[in-house]
């Protein structure tokens, strides 16, 4: 579709700004290769004005975390009547809220680690309850890219982690630690892509392991049997549908030594950087990076605008 004008939204004010810019820059290069007119813009105070000036045919949402994955930008774009890539308002808001997502998974009988939620806004930081066995995985209630995720193995580490977390987030989850191999499965459209095994250089798939060169190895297709492949793909599709996600998503798993898969994280807007998992999985399925970007753009165009009460 020569002449198609695509606005790529990247950056934003959150902790995942740099990763978002990496994703958006990669998408911009792909759009140029495809012959589309790519226009980049930041999600800042001039966003609506800049979007009106660009007047794009479609928006490619390359934001991550708060503002980009929580329904905020989705609401703005629907208000303006501009088609955009990825999931809608409600699905994004639910998927970024780890507590709400886990409640839905548990209600549907889908495997997720046991967890507790702690409020850090009361002035008195919570002590480690005696009922919680260590280690625990502490993470912000609403964040992506493994930002702020820490494995707590001692009471001393708990106190330090809580103090640091209170400076960044109002609530945390403390999840049961599950040992095992890490896997990920993306959904594109209504199809589960090949499984990738993640072999992090650190003790888990941390922010650095995700985005720093050499931080992890991606084995795709994962060296697992057909039965486990099928179970992980089925789980990824179940999670995608349960949360009402669309276009694409990525679900991360841990598989215990007994072979039991557990859902760790759901990503409504998977990263599109050079070290991201989704492009690796798509390539194994026969889609180049450019073809993946093209597919996502055309999903949005085919869907069109949602409510559209204001013209850009």
Labelled PLM ranges:
Residues 1-96, 100-103, 107, 119-128, ...:
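ATP-binding N-terminal substructure of ATP-dependent carboxylate-amine bond-forming enzymes
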Residues 1-10, 38, 51-53, 94-181:
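Active-site nucleotide/adenylate-binding loops and adjacent lid/helix of ATP-dependent enzymes
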Residues 3-9, 212-222, 277:
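A short small-residue
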Residues 4, 107-109, 225-312:
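ATP-dependent carboxylate activation and anion-phosphoryl transfer catalytic cores
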Residues 73-78, 204-212, 268:
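Short, flexible, mixed-charge acidic loops at enzyme active sites
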Residues 75-84, 154-159, 284-285:
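A glycine- and small-aliphatic-rich helix-loop capping segment at beta-alpha/alpha-beta transitions
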Residues 153-234, 255-262:
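Phosphate-binding site of ATP-dependent enzymes
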């Amino acid at each position: 579709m020569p002449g198609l004008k695509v606005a790529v939204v990247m950056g934003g004010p959150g902790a995942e700004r740099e990763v978002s810019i990496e994703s958006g820059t990669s998408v911009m290069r792909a759009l140029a290769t495809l012959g589309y007119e790519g226009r980049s813009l930041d999600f800042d105070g001039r966003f609506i004005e800049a979007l009106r000036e660009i007047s794009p045919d479609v928006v490619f949402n390359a934001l991550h975390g708060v503002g980009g994955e929580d329904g905020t930008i989705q609401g703005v774009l629907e208000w303006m009547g501009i088609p955009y890539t990825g999931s809608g308002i409600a699905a994004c808001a639910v998927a970024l809220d780890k507590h709400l997502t886990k409640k839905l998974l548990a209600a549907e009988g889908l495997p997720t680690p046991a967890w507790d939620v702690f409020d850090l806004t009361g002035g008195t930081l919570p002590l480690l309850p005696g009922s919680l066995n260590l280690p625990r995985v502490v993470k912000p209630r609403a964040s992506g890219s493994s930002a702020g995720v820490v494995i707590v193995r001692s009471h001393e580490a708990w106190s330090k982690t809580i103090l640091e977390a209170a400076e960044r987030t109002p609530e945390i989850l403390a999840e049961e630690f599950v040992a095992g191999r890490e896997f990920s499965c993306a959904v594109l459209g209504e199809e589960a892509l090949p499984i990738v095994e993640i072999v992090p250089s650190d003790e888990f798939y941390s922010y650095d392991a995700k985005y720093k060169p050499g931080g992890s190895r991606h084995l795709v297709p994962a060296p697992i049997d057909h039965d486990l492949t099928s179970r992980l793909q089925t789980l990824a599709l179940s999670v995608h549908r349960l949360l009402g996600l669309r276009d694409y998503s990525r679900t991360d798993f841990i598989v215990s030594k007994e072979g039991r898969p557990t859902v760790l994280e759901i990503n409504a807007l998977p990263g599109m950087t050079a070290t991201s998992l989704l492009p690796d999985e798509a390539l194994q399925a026969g889609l180049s990076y450019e073809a993946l970007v093209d597919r996502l753009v055309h999903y949005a165009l085919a869907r069109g605008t949602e409510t559209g009460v204001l013209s850009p």
